[in-house]
Amino acid sequence: MYEDKINSAVAQQQALLDPFFIAHQEVLAGFAAHLTTTFQNGGRLFLAGSGPFAAIASLLGQQFLHRQTLERPSLPAVSLTHDAGLATFLAAEDQASQLFSRQLRALANDQDTLLLLAGTTLSPADREVLTTARQIGCRTALICAVHTELADTMPELLLQLPTDSLPRLLEGTLFAGHLLCALVEGELFGI
């Protein structure tokens, strides 16, 4: 019984990743090249994600900042997801949708990039940070499910995972983020 569940989860993940990376290989390589240039020119990467994607945004930010595979200089990456005090303060004033956008507006400039991680829906905070990033002049990227309703919040770079399963979305998003970090590390530090 356990073996069947394990085999099913592995098969689902393979069915997700194979078409995703075939369809998005050039986009991922282009985004990695953009981030490499951004870091070389003094720009920063800001990461955001709501719900369970906040943890992934935080982890990926740490891997860019500290390291993923080797000892190297820090890369300027900032996760906007871990300020619990600000989240509580804004929620108390019915301004929870400003959690990411307030931080981005205070910290970012037009040399920076925002990477937003989302599931099958965009939260009000997700939508607002995309809008704010565009107003500032940041480059915007989004990793989300293929059926996510974007409406007027279309990012410049869109990577859509072909599933609506939350566990598979989380795993696929984390894998894509790890790959992105590895590509940037490889280009900047020769690994």
Regions found by a protein language model. Name each.
Residues 1-23:
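Generic N-terminal amphipathic, Lys/Arg-enriched alpha-helix
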Residues 12, 34, 63, 103, ...:
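Alpha-helical scaffold segments in soluble metabolic enzymes
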Residues 22-25, 89-95, 119, 137:
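Short, flexible loop segments at the rims of nucleotide/cofactor-binding pockets, characterized by
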Residues 56-58, 89, 125-128, 152, ...:
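Short glycine-/acidic-enriched loop or helix-start segments at secondary-structure transitions
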Residues 144-191:
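Short alpha-helices
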